[in-house]
Design a protein with these regions (language model features):
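A short, N-terminal "cap"/entry segment at the start of jelly-roll beta-barrel domains
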Residues: 25-81, 170-183
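Conserved short histidine dyad/triad with adjacent acidic residue
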Residues: 78-98, 127, 136-138
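Glycine- and acidic-residue-biased ligand/ion/polar-headgroup-sensing regions
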Residues: 88-91, 98-118
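Short beta-strand His + acidic residue motifs that chelate non-heme Fe in jelly-roll/DSBH
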Residues: 93-95, 113-114, 135, 140-148
Length: 183
């Protein structure tokens, strides 16, 4: 648990430092005059310090609704994982729960969350950038970004896999799995 929290906090710090605008606020190094946006020298050895620059993050999904970028691990397999989720304004999940506890850090924007079994945007609560949250195992919730937001909500989601997600009805009872889409 402590190791996972260190991974989470370390990943969150790296992401927070790589947010747009941070480089302009960082004063140059007095010895080299380098800034985060204009580094001098070579990047760290990736065998010692693996890294992915923001421009190299691979986003998948619907750019009008929800996009996902896997940073490390795989939530369908055993072990730790870290995923960025980008909720575009007006996009929400449906009520569901996960069988494993997960930890969330809001990187940017406003992430709207509800613990209601009923899908109604009026029951969501805003978690602004910088908010940390725990998604307790087997508790119903749903989340996304409200219509009218000026930017997507980006969250860093971490946990231990494998994790199973179960959609629920308005009574909180599991729904049967959806049939695969036909081509």
């Amino acid at each position: 648990m402590q190791t996972l929290l260190k991974i989470f906090l370390g990943g969150g710090l790296v992401l927070a430092l790589s947010r747009p605008g941070h480089a302009q606020q960082t004063p140059p190094d007095p010895a080299t005059h380098a800034t985060l946006s204009d580094p001098e020298g070579r990047p760290p050895d990736s065998a010692h310090i693996p890294f992915v620059l923001p421009k190299d993050i691979k986003w998948t999904g619907d750019p009008k609704r929800q996009e996902t970028a896997v940073l490390f691990g795989d939530q369908s397999k055993e072990g730790p994982y870290g995923v960025l989720i980008k909720w575009h304004p007006g996009a929400f999940s449906r009520p569901h729960f996960h069988d494993q506890t997960r930890w969330i850090y809001v990187v940017s924007g406003t992430w709207w969350v509800s613990s209601s079994n009923v899908y109604d945007e009026k029951t969501t609560y805003p978690f602004h950038a910088g908010t940390f949250s725990t998604d307790v195992a087997n508790t119903v919730h749903w989340d996304g970004a409200r219509s009218g937001e000026k930017e997507p909500a980006v969250i860093l989601l971490t946990g231990m896999g494998p994790v199973k997600t179960v959609q629920v009805d308005e009574n909180g009872k599991p729904l049967p799995p959806r049939a695969p889409a036909k081509e």
